[in-house]
Amino acid sequence: MNVLGIETTCDETAAAIVTAAEDGRAVIRANEVLSQIAEHAAYGGVVPEIAARAHVEVVDRLIARALQEAGLGFDDLDGIAVAAGPGLIGGVLVGLVTAKTLSLVTRKPLLAVNHLEAHALTARMTDGIAFPYLLLLASGGHTQLVAVKGVGEYVRLGTTIDDAIGEAFDKAAKLLGLAYPGGPEVERAAEGGDPERFALPRPMLGRREPNFSLSGLKTALRIEAERIAPLSGQDVADLCASFQAAVVDVVVDRVRVALRAFGDVAGHPTALVAAGGVAANAALRRALSQLAGEAGLPLVAPPLPLCGDNGAMIAWAGLERLRLGLVDDITAPARPRWPFAEPLATAG
């Protein structure tokens, strides 16, 4: 089975072809990603109108390139998957209209995929892990701890009550005068810094519910930066290292709490999975790997090119749904907001 995946929910335009082999393994035949970082860098963040226009300009070309790289034509496809949300509505519409048009013309099934669900299922594409598993989904706009019980079966154990982890990194970078996107810049600066120089708080540490709160940490960082201004290069490095260490400590503590809660929801997990753009952070990966080892679990984190938004994860999520007969009507809506995990309090 071959599925085309289209991703346009934020500032990456992506198209990919993923094949499900007879033994169930995933083969990524093509994975084209075009980032818009250069277009948004001057604004310090993503400008929705600019993002949507950029998607319009390149999405058709990326689809053609993906098909060419895979050595396939539209007749060889078994389905067309697209991220129908959540995300910036203009970008989501670009991808969805493109996918619907292709579905109508080629008469291939439309698979309207939840972008967050695609992140959640990426580990099955890369490592073939079985359900159930504990997912840490950490990106620029989302931070959740989820019990992944099956395709379409997700129970949210915890979430952020204010800033997402990626959002906090971006705001920290902007505060310290670093470039956009902030996550990689903070991580790079932290490599030369002293993580113990500044005693930044660890919000929510020790709380029974595995929720996150990072706004207080961001405020503490600003206070320290203002206290020692003007900042030298070493000051910035030390602030970044201290900030990153605090975030990692908070995440590890919250994941530990979620692991304890997992058994009551879904039994014994097969793995701890980290997904989303923040999962590319090396310090976080090391800490999560140690935690997983202590719990007797493997840490499964996608290869770095598959941590951020990409078309392969959309294609794979489409394949997972297609194999269960979960196809969508041509009237499937664009959903700028689209929760994918049921809160624990309402889970059956």
UniProtKB/Swiss-Prot annotation:
Query: Carries keyword Metal-binding?
Result: yes
Gene Ontology MF annotations: iron ion binding; N(6)-L-threonylcarbamoyladenine synthase activity
Print the keywords alphabetically: Acyltransferase, Cytoplasm, Iron, Metal-binding, Transferase, tRNA processing
What compartments host this protein? Answer: Cytoplasm
Q: Where does substrate bind?
A: 137-141, 170, 183, 281
GO cellular component assignments: cytoplasm
Which reaction does this chain catalyze?
L-threonylcarbamoyladenylate + adenosine(37) in tRNA = N(6)-L-threonylcarbamoyladenosine(37) in tRNA + AMP + H(+)
Cofactor note, please? Binds 1 Fe(2+) ion per subunit.
Say which domain of life the source belongs to. Answer: Bacteria
Q: What is its EC number?
A: 2.3.1.234
Give the family, as the similarity comment puts it: Belongs to the KAE1 / TsaD family.
HAMAP family for the chain: TsaD
The protein's job, in short, is: Required for the formation of a threonylcarbamoyl group on adenosine at position 37 (t(6)A37) in tRNAs that read codons beginning with adenine. Is involved in the transfer of the threonylcarbamoyl moiety of threonylcarbamoyl-AMP (TC-AMP) to the N6 group of A37, together with TsaE and TsaB. TsaD likely plays a direct catalytic role in this reaction.
Q: What is this protein called?
A: tRNA N6-adenosine threonylcarbamoyltransferase
Q: Which source organism?
A: Methylobacterium sp. (strain 4-46)
The UniProt gene name for this protein comes to tsaD
